[in-house]
Each structure stands twice: as C-alpha cells, then as structure tokens.
Amino acid sequence: MKTVRNIFGTGTLYDSPDLQGKIYATCAACMSVWSDFLSWANVHKERMVKSIEDADTIVVLCCQVTDLAVYNDIKVCERLNKQTGKSIFISGCLAQRFDIDLPDYIKRLDVVRVKNQPLYDKTLVHYEPPFWVKGFEETCETLSLKQGDLFRNFYPLKIGAGCNGNCKYCTIRHTRGEGYEMSARDQVDEFLAFDNVVLISDSPTVKQIKDWCEIAIENNKEISFRNMEPYVLVACEKEVVDLSRKGLLRILHCPIQSFDDEVLKIMNRNIPATKKAVEIMQEVRKSGTLVATNIIIDYVHNGKVYPNYYKQLLEEKFDYFAWNPYFDGHFDLKRAEERFDKYIV
C-alpha cells in the first residue's frame, strides 16, 4: 500500500502483495488492462479461482474512458459486493482517478502486470460482456464483426503499455501506470506459440510495427494490429501494405476518431495523417485485410456539440467500427446514469 499523487489528486493505491489468499478477477475494461492482470495471473495460477464463491479476494479491472464506462464499473463492483459481502479491489485506469469518488467497499489497486509473460491460460481472468451491447452472447469466433466481439477471442500479445500522445479528450497517459515498450525480437517465440495473435499496447510504436511486419513475413504467419495510431500507420505504410498483400495481415485496427477536420483539430489530432490512414486502410482491404476503427460522437467544444457520426462513411470505409460518446472528464453519478440510459439502448 502506498500514497500516490498524480494529476487527479492524492490517494492510496494497494499493490499485488496486498491481495490475500485465493483471487477471483474479472475485467470490465479493455484488452490492454485485461492482459496486464492476466500476465500476473499466469505467474500465480495456483492462487486464481474461477468461481467467486471460492475467493478470498475479488479484483475488478476497470475503465474510465467515458462516464458510461465508470458507471458500468461501479455497477459491476456493486453486484459482486452484494453477492459476496467482500471488499472489491479495482485496478485498471479507474483506480488512478482519485477525483472520482467511489463506494467505501472499493480499494484502489495499482497496475499489476508481469512483462514478457506468455498468457497460457486466458480463462484465469473473467471477461465481462461489453456493457454497450445488450444481450451480448459469447462465441468462439475469431473473425466475428459483431459489435463488442472484435479481438475478444484472439491471443493478446502484450508488446507495451502507456501512450505519449496529447489528445485533448484522453487521459491514458496518466492512468496506465509506468509505460514500457517490448522489443519485438524478444517475443518471437511467444508469437509462434499461439494462434490468432493480436498485438496489444495502448499505442504501438513505429519501430514495433515495422519489426512485427518483418517477423510475420519471415515466419509466414498471420498477425493483427490493434490501436495503431494514424501517424504510425502512415509511417509504416510500405510494411503494412506489403504484409497485407502477402495475406498475413488479418485485422488492422486504427482509431481515426473523426472524419471532420474541425473536430480533429479540436481534439489535437493529426489531420493529414488521419486522412492518409483511411486511404491506406482502403488499400489493405483490397488484399482481404479487415479494417476497424473508433470514433467519438457528440463531441463538445466551447458549448458546441459536434455529432461526429458519419454512419454512411463509416460503413463504407470500415468493416467494423465502434463509438464512444464524448466525456468531459468530470464524473457525476446521476448524469452518468442518465447518459447510460440515453446511449445504451
């Protein structure tokens, strides 16, 4: 346990040694956060339980990308607390948000991860269904384009964490713990050992993408990329297109966030790179690569609302897209509940 100060204030964070006995863990966050704790769980497999009734300690991995996500996090914790009467440790991005008040039964846990650890057993950490998809049904498909299912059944190869970007709407650079970047050559054995590999990082670097394109071609093995920023895709255009033309790039996920130059400028995003990235994604589609993206809808700036939902363009340019409603970073439980009812229909 330690006292931590960050841009969100000062608070107490517990560490992995504070987790007692048998542990049940579930994830209501993204694959980056899920695979973090999963790496630790695979090292301490004998302590992980798959039934919450057998647990001494409960961990919920949480998100804070929108107030809807925070609201869902709280609801998951509330459900498990009522079910067991136990305190809940939360890890992931929400744990670092000391400005967001949480129920007394919740304890904040720092980022828990083991670098360069193969994830032999992905079932050690339960994955909550995507809250924005009502009636979500699990599948075993790896090429499902059903909402909320992208990469869900892939093998998450952890190549790093953290982001040095300065997008105005994003706080990842402050909530993901100490950032790191793995050398691709150090993870070749892991890449070869598992099927349906997707690279997992909050923001893969140019060097990582170029190296992994080379490795995939050397080994004639399919790979997928997630969270590749537009400027990275542009810098790696030749390598990515070559990989796709060889039939080895299965899915390319690149978050463009908007088609609108004005909105991109407000977001502090790279406008030329975004436009070029969309062009590159159309090029790799010709070779059979599936392309996916994220956007932020109802973006607010200086009191003006930008709907930012170009449905026809999104359906034309992408095989899969997901959206988040703009979140100003100030969490209010009542407002979050109202917005949850508005957007999750």
Regions found by a protein language model. Give the residues of each.
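Canonical Radical SAM [4Fe-4S] cluster-binding loop centered on the CxxxCxxC motif
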Residues: 1, 148-185
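N-terminal [4Fe-4S]-dependent radical SAM core
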Residues: 1-21, 118-157
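Cofactor-cradling patches in redox/metallo enzymes
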Residues: 2-122
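Glycine/threonine-rich flexible loop motifs
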Residues: 67-76, 178-180, 262-269
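Aromatic/hydrophobic pocket-lining residues that form the small-molecule binding cavity
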Residues: 70-73, 184-187, 209-212, 236, ...
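Conserved SAM/AdoMet-binding glycine-rich loop
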Residues: 88-89, 96-97, 192-302
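Radical SAM enzyme [4Fe-4S]-AdoMet core and its adjacent flexible, acidic
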Residues: 206-219, 316-345
